[in-house]
């Protein structure tokens, strides 16, 4: 049954899960995650007329982007607690900060997703872009936007790296074997790497080399660095972990 | 105790459940389903006067229709995870899409239920129909309405069929016996059949043979096809499964 | 450990619980109950000024009445599923109706509690009664109020009696002993008795013997019948159950 | 495994937990706590323009204060039920009162945190203080504010002390050893001490020795007494518990 459980969860069966029994921290966190995605979608006005109904359908793409991002964070949270089952005060404190940052960024994320959908909708000719509804669309505001989301993304992944660092600190008590220790260290580094991209974007935005939209466009596109970083890092770690498992 | 559990759940005792232990995906999904039915009912304005109170009671029938539909989807979700207990990334992705479609359609469903209740309330002489509060009641808007809900229903049942297809793909790992494999394949086909009705309705609406209300009335009544389809399909599968169990 | 569990739950240790393992129906229902009491309190406007803050505190008593009523219903729900652990389609259908009636009555309950608090607050000289904010305060509206809440209370306890009736029907499958069968039958009758009071109040209101406020005052005070009914019924059943346990 | 569980929970491994299996009271309470912190953050208006977005970011500090306070209460709730696993009627009643007080104070807490942030933001020169948006900022209103929050804090910790008193009353049934009895008695006293500070603040506010802002400033700063009280009390109890464990 052990092999089936690990595999049906799609996780690496070489890691023995300490957190199969759901704890209250996870039940509480699941309720907050569920509230976040639900209120993101259902905090809009209720369509009373046909016109309202079609207007509300315009938000489907932005909502899809936001829900996907939140679920990615939920999945990281789910894997962490499945692996270690930690419930100590430090983990609860870090978990609270994670949930707080998530909640603070639900509505700003909705704003950003609508804003980007309006821009890309126009670029791909799907809709007629009307950015005026977002208020004063200035370079200063775009810079603040990038700083705002850079801080949010940075905080989320920093907290995850601290949570994995916490698990690493309790490695003897959790009785982690050498493979599991390596896996934990890789998670710390992976999340620190995920932190570094928004940090870089933040720095570029604050330096603001061109003093105009080019800065914010660059700091926006920097987020595509996630793809190569994760591919390269994934290759390095999987090579090492295969060697560890053979030993 | 095994026989009692299967039977108290009202499920076919020949299927051994892999998902008796609740997982976080189910806890998270239950919170979203609970939010969906609650916000559907409680997102209306709070009655401050007697007049508000009676006006709010007018929504009871539309709400009952919506809550019943959402619970039918919840029950399908409940049975799927009880049967297979899957928690891998693909299942989580499909589950996220299912919850997202559900949330996007909560308010539109409320609109549709109110709109249909207004029409049928008038036909049965219960209330004086006043469709003006729904905005411009044109053939074009009704067509968009049918397309909108056709897509929603199509998406929900397509995701369920993909989830059962996922379970079918993991049949050796889940150690499904021949009866359970047959049951899983039947579920894939059942959900594909459930997909086909809204698809048919969508196509009729887009072709719009009459160019007036007759098209939307026909595409609406097509949904009654569910009854004969499910009865016939149910008979076929139960005959085959009895034969399988005897063998 | 068995004795401790029953006793820490404060339940009659002679009844062996079939539902100790939480099911998804209970997790889903708990989320709806939690949403009901939370939205009842938090659906008010957010205090932005000191004046708003004091105005919001005026609602504490009405909210306390509503939350107490909802928790009484939650406790009944909790005991039922703890006793029988049923998860079949009929139980899920009855549970859905129960949750639906609960949700439909959250805001009307808030209205009624505010209305009664305004009246009794004035009678006891705590506040200056101002019923004008509730709209047209006529005999006709009060009658509708009594009919409205009579139907709600009647529906809640009727569903509970049907749920216990369902458990009674599955007594052999649930392997209930004679004491447990007696306990289940008592629960059916108790809930039917709880149904009878709102039914009586409804009938009196519809007959409306005096054609003025005296009718609604009488149909309101009929609810105090709950106390003697439950005391007398409690005595009868505990006598019989003691005899059953001795045999 | 026992030692690991206690330690990963960060609790004193000398206390054997009776409540490892999550009960419905905890699932229900977790949903209410999750709703409290989510609605606290997400009950604000949704930012539609850049200006709204920056205005909404101004609330981050006040929200952080409120979420931290609510999580401290959640942690106390979590530890209580983990230790004793009680589910009897008295515990459910006390738990309901706790959740009710929590819900009633979510919005007032949001008001207080915004108010204090405005004042301290001005003192530390971070923002330009504008207290006019809070309505009439008089000595009378500040007194009512201190009374209001004094009652809330008093009620929360009084309920916790009653819950621990309930566990103490069931010590033989829960089979508590001498160390666990001492730990339970300490929790009663600790919560009564936590009650005493808001009580003292309340009394000072009602006596109102200076008849001006000095009274409310004093009654506000009294809350800093929590720190020395908890340090001294912590030292006394840990000395006694070490001696008990040695015996």
From Swiss-Prot, chains A, B, C, D:
The keyword Membrane applies. Its main location: membrane. It catalyses: K(+)(in) = K(+)(out). The record marks 39 as: Hydrophobic filter residue 2. Keywords: Cell membrane, Ion channel, Ion transport, Membrane, Potassium, Potassium channel, Potassium transport, Transmembrane, Transmembrane helix, Transport. GO terms for biological process: potassium ion transmembrane transport; protein homotetramerization. The keyword Transport applies. Changing residue 38 to A: Decreased selectivity for potassium ion. A motif (RxxxFSD motif) lies at residues 24-30. Signal peptide: none annotated. InterPro entries: TMEM175-like. One of its GO terms (cellular component) is plasma membrane. Belongs to the TMEM175 family. Potassium channel; forms a potassium-permeable leak-like channel with weak selectivity for potassium. The channel is permeable for K(+), Rb(+) and Cs(+). The six transmembrane regions are tightly packed within each subunit without undergoing domain swapping. Transmembranes TM1-TM3 are positioned on the inner circle of the channel tetramer and participate in inter-subunit interactions that are central to the assembly of the ion conduction pore. The RxxxFSD motif within transmembrane TM1 coordinates a network of specific inter- and intra-subunit interactions with other conserved residues on TM2 and TM3 and plays a key role in the tetrameric assembly of the channel. This is Potassium channel Ftrac_2467. It comes from Marivirga tractuosa (strain ATCC 23168 / DSM 4126 / NBRC 15989 / NCIMB 1408 / VKM B-1430 / H-43) (Microscilla tractuosa).
């Amino acid at each position: 049954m052990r092999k089936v459980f690990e595999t049906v969860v799609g996780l690496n069966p070489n890691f023995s899960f300490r957190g199969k029994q759901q704890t209250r921290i996870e039940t509480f966190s699941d309720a907050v995650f569920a509230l976040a995605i639900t209120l993101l979608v259902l905090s809009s006005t209720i369509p009373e007329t046909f016109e309202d109904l079609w207007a509300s359908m315009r938000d489907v793409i932005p909502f899809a982007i936001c829900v996907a991002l939140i679920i990615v964070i939920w999945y990281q949270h789910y894997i962490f607690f499945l692996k270690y089952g930690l419930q100590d005060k430090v983990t609860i404190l870090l978990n609270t900060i994670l949930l707080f940052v998530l909640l603070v960024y639900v509505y700003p994320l909705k704003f950003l997703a609508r804003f980007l959908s309006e821009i890309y909708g126009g670029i791909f000719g799907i809709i007629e872009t009307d950015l005026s509804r977002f208020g004063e669309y200035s370079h200063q505001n775009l810079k603040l936007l990038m700083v705002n989301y850079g801080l949010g993304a940075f905080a989320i992944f920093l907290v995850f790296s601290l949570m994995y660092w916490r698990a690493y600190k309790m490695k003897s008590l959790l009785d982690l074997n050498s493979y599991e220790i390596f896996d934990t260290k890789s998670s710390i580094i992976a999340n620190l790497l995920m932190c570094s991209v928004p940090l870089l974007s933040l720095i570029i935005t604050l330096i603001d080399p061109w003093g105009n939209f080019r800065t914010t466009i660059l700091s926006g596109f920097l987020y595509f660095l996630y793809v190569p970083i994760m591919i390269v890092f994934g290759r390095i770690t999987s090579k090492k972990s295969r060697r560890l498992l053979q030993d």
